[in-house]
Amino acid sequence: MSGKGKVHGGKGKSSETAKSTTSHSARAGLQFPVGRIKRYLKRTAQNKIRVGSKSAIYLTAVLEYLTAEVLELAGNAAKDLKVKRITPRHLQLAIRGDEELDNLIKATIAFGGVLPHINKALLLKVEKKKQK
């Protein structure tokens, strides 16, 4: 032994045969980070509860789906108003326009404004005046 370290060409993996690492998100076919969601779950779990990898993948998929749903509805609202940028107002219109999302998201959206609403009793009086 000359003491010059390991001899190359032995049983070690070469760069050609080494597998490239794939993220949990790529394996699950998701865009949101599964590893980060798992870390957040571990951090917020009480009494050092173990968190399974499938639970993190499932939660990530749910979050990604809800985000895509809200963005699709907000994009439609922006397209209806003939603008190319989604603003908080478009998010507000999208969320409050969908009954299920409205029940799910009870938060106030900053700079979202209010939904236009006219009481039906007021509309009836206006229509009666037009008929006369």
Swiss-Prot record:
SMART domains: H2A (SM00414)
Compartments, record wording: Nucleus; Chromosome
Pfam families for the chain: Histone (PF00125), Histone_H2A_C (PF16211)
Keyword hit for Aminoacyl-tRNA synthetase: no
Modified residues (N6-acetyllysine): 4, 11, 13
Modified residues (N-acetylserine): 2
InterPro entries found in the cross-reference section: Histone-fold (IPR009072), Histone_H2A (IPR002119), Histone_H2A/H2B/H3 (IPR007125), Histone_H2A_C (IPR032454), Histone_H2A_CS (IPR032458)
Location of region: Disordered: 1-27
The protein's role, per its UniProt record: Variant histone H2A which can replace H2A in some nucleosomes. Nucleosomes wrap and compact DNA into chromatin, limiting DNA accessibility to the cellular machineries which require DNA as a template. Histones thereby play a central role in transcription regulation, DNA repair, DNA replication and chromosomal stability. DNA accessibility is regulated via a complex set of post-translational modifications of histones, also called histone code, and nucleosome remodeling.
Protein name per Swiss-Prot or TrEMBL: Histone H2A.Z
Lineage: Eukaryota, Fungi, Dikarya, Ascomycota, Saccharomycotina
Gene (name only): HTZ1
